[in-house]
């Protein structure tokens, strides 16, 4: 029973932490709301406010992902990897659907990176390297035909490869949990664009 309570606390605290979306906080500090023009992650903040703001927002979002997993390691060490998977899902889902900001948040990439940085840094490094290597190849071959931004394409291809890498290097449960939360958000964003 105690483990169940610990897991519930980990999930709720991770979700609430994820709901503190740095891009929204930054833009509100300027008397605006970035979500009226863009997503509140690092890329949207870069487009709206420049490099310095984007770096600060991205770092804050990465740190909250790392903090959520650290919280899981501290509160529920007896329930690993379930605790860290719940923390990863919670912080990413909270970033995407923040309770503090009307359930309208970012895409979840930075908190996912932060969580994976703590749980499975080698899995993260290998997956990001693979995704970045795909981008120039995609732009040279498929992008003219598909007319889809390179980042979503690289993400779609890198997630299954990342799961394969995680099965060898570790962090599979957390990788799957974070990918699931980002996948829900991606489907939601695509549905909004088509409506």
UniProtKB/Swiss-Prot annotation:
One of its GO terms (biological process) is phospholipid biosynthetic process. It is found in: Cell membrane. It comes from the Bacteria. It comes from Deinococcus radiodurans (strain ATCC 13939 / DSM 20539 / JCM 16871 / CCUG 27074 / LMG 4051 / NBRC 15346 / NCIMB 9279 / VKM B-1422 / R1). Keywords: Cell membrane, Lipid biosynthesis, Lipid metabolism, Membrane, Phospholipid biosynthesis, Phospholipid metabolism, Transferase, Transmembrane, Transmembrane helix. GO terms for cellular component: plasma membrane. Pathway: Lipid metabolism; phospholipid metabolism. SMART domains: G3P_acyltransf (SM01207). It catalyses: an acyl phosphate + sn-glycerol 3-phosphate = a 1-acyl-sn-glycero-3-phosphate + phosphate. This is Glycerol-3-phosphate acyltransferase 2. It holds the Pfam family G3P_acyltransf. It is a multi-pass membrane protein. The gene is plsY2. Its EC number is 2.3.1.275. Probably interacts with PlsX.
